Amino acid sequence: MASFHANSARKAFNSLQSAVTFYAHNVSAHAAMSLVADAVDIVVFVDREVTATGTVRYVSEILEVHELAENGQPASTPIFGPDPAREEFDPRGYPLHQPEGNALWARRAGLDLNWLHPSRGEWAQPFPERQLA
């Protein structure tokens, strides 16, 4: 497990690729992205927003990472993300669907995948009122 800073879950791939090529000068950009796709199981994106009561941090997206795709980026599946029906007033993530494949990463981490079932996808508290600009 590691912490890495990026502006979105998908932008984490390019940031990780840049780090690999910066520190391993003999690795091509394509090889670096392939290493990222092989090494990363999931990306958890924690976002933040200023609300009327202060800054709130929340999980907005979880991507399950797969092999390198033809476009040169790791293929990924959003398993947790914003609900379009609620996004206007609640940007937090909600379960979208179960992970693909055997989800070995989840078992290794002790994650009960039942928590990613849409019927269990409710936060304990409503999202705080947004601060007016």
Q: Where are the regions a protein language model picked out?
A:
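Conserved P-loop NTPase nucleotide-binding/switch module
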Residues: 1-42, 50-58
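NTP-binding/hydrolysis catalytic cores, primarily Walker-type P-loop NTPases
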Residues: 53-133
